[in-house]
Amino acid sequence: MSMDELDPHVARALTLAARFQSALDGTLNQMNNGSFRATDEAETVEVTINGHQWLTGLRIEDGLLKKLGAEAVAQRVNEALHNAQAAASAYNDAAGEQLTAALSAMSRAMNEGMA
């Protein structure tokens, strides 16, 4: 049976389900394979986190520990981590909104089909 032979509401729901699956796959792919990179304000420390917000990379400018000391560098690492987490959270929020919109559209299409 082709999409042309289906009830229009069923066909729409299937199309929306495929769109939702695609959006979900994209979100999961970003979480598993993506990365978010950020620096401190002075750009002396750079961190990389993955989509699960696990630290996967850290770069500290040469000589910074000696110049500023461990406490100041730790503050910069935390600042960079905060910035990377903010970027990851913004991405996750947008992805969540896309998934919610796709589910809502699917629900409306199915409800219209039952009416």
UniProtKB/Swiss-Prot annotation:
Acetylation among keywords: yes
Example of a GO MF term: DNA binding
Chain segments annotated as transmembrane: none
UniProtKB keywords: Acetylation
GO CC terms: peptidoglycan-based cell wall; plasma membrane
Residues modified as N-acetylserine: S2
Pfam families, sorted: YbaB_DNA_bd (PF02575)
UniProt function note: Probably plays a role in host phagosome maturation arrest.
Name of the molecule in the record: ESX-1 secretion-associated protein EspL
The species this protein was found in: Mycobacterium tuberculosis (strain ATCC 25618 / H37Rv)
Name of the gene encoding the protein in the UniProt record: espL
